Amino acid sequence: NGVFSYGTGTTVNISESMITTTADNSGGIQTTGGTTNATNLVVSTSGNSSAAIRSDRGGGTVNVDGGSYVSNGYNSPAVYSTADITVKNAFLTANNSEALVIEGKNSITLENCTVTGNMSDTKGSSSEENVHNVMIYQSMSGDADVGTSTFSMTGGTLTAKNGDMIYVTNTHCVLTLSGVTIQNKDADGALLRVVGNSASHGWGTAGSNGAQVEFTADNQTLSGDIVVDTISTLNMKLTGGSTFTGTINIVDNAQNGTAVSNNAVVTIESGCTWTLTGDCVITSLTNSGTINFNGYTITLADGTVLR
């Protein structure tokens, strides 16, 4: 690793520096306990499993302001979090991986960042389950405590070159987007996928390893499809004048797990708009805003069909 903070009570301060790593398993800045404060760094990693900003067992706190953080290997996000990581005013680029990963009871908070991921397939990836730009999960490996994962992004740009924008599995997640420009270059990629997984990597037990997501979009423009499987839950709220153009649908769990209730609960506050691009199936809807049906329908769990 280029810079390494280890152990509770350790503090590393670094600024105006260039860090380059070339080997596998070699991150740019790594925190395993303690605190790392980084300002205006230029970080580049070339190896596989070499996130530009990363943490490991032991958690810790990472504060980054300014700079450029680029990874080039497989399984090498720009940021991999098993800690509490805050990044402001930075460029975060993963050229052969998803852009961001949060594992377990940890967080990534971004403010005014330009984030780009390019996970073209699952080769060499930590996920054989899905191609995506942001992954939020619990591996059950012991690297991260079980608990709520938190992803918050305010301002900036979030770009996916392939796959789904956000993929959540086997964890509880609080997700907040506010004023982010979201660009998915893959027309077939979902905006958000909240599902179980095959457990081939040990991520929980197949059929009972869904995700639970609380998603707030505030002053946010959203576009794309949202998919929730029958062993997962999504509580989604549009607020602050947000607009969503797309669909929300509940699908069967691929591993035939026992279904849970309240799979997709949607709240649209006053001043917000949902424009449908296809038929939708959700659990319930609280609407104080506007829905443009465009000839499509919303089917609720009680059998009500809105049109």
Segments from the language model and where they lie:
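Beta-strand-rich solenoid/repeat architectures in extracellular/passenger domains
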Residues: 1, 10-25, 35-49, 53, ...
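Predominantly extracellular/luminal carbohydrate-interaction, adhesion, and secreted-enzyme modules
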Residues: 1-7, 27-33, 50-57, 74-82, ...
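A generic short-segment signal for beta-strand/edge and adjacent turn/coil regions
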Residues: 6-8, 12, 22-23, 32, ...
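Generic structural motif
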Residues: 8, 58, 105, 118, ...
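Short "repeat-start/strand-capping" segments in structured domains, especially the N-termini
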Residues: 8-11, 33-37, 60, 82-85, ...
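Clustered cysteine/histidine zinc-coordinating segments, centered on FYVE zinc fingers that bind PI3P
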Residues: 130-143, 147, 155, 163, ...
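Extracellular beta-solenoid/beta-roll
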Residues: 184, 204-214, 219-307
